[in-house]
Amino acid sequence: MATLPLFPLGTVLMPGARLPLQIFEPRYVQLLKDLLDGQDERLPVFGVIAIREGFEVGDDGVRALHPVGCGALLVQAAALEGERFLAVSEGTDRFHLDAIDESAGTPYTTARITWLTEPDGDVPAITVLAARLRAELTAFAAATGAEAELPTEDRSLAYAVPDTVSLDVADRQRLLASSDTESRLRLGIRLVRREREFADALGAVGRAPIPPFSLN
């Protein structure tokens, strides 16, 4: 079990994704300063975790937060006018929120967490599923005019779905919390197909052909 400073947000950070933040609230300004202080040898990593629907940003406690979040490596920080900062971070590994560390003594929330591994699931299926998801995303982008800069690594592909398809927090959280790569790819395919059907029903897209395929 490790400890990690948390930045609760109304969004979900995916591994490999960039997250720009404008920081002005005093407790998170302090978090940023602590990360930049460099008094220990650890990388400047904090945890981004989504707030559950019905709770506010200021609500404390595990109940207000989703159980799975993503580490965020601070890659850039710049001071703005006043006590404001612009920071850019990049998603690293997923973690499970075990408990709030009440003894941390920090103005921001510090948590006890467990870093999560990335199991593959059914390895033979992954290549097929990744090819299908890549085709679905490419067709969706072509039909809607969205950008689709897709990672080449199969394991990372499902994490990139929100970059092309607009998903709400609940769906993003389901992708992040999927137990393995296989199940995440399957979920990604279902989500892209659903959004394409929504867009078709609204008359917003044409029909870029996709070869027949079964998830079974």
Kindly label every feature range from the protein language model.
Residues 1-216:
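N-terminal low-complexity, acidic/polar interaction/targeting segments
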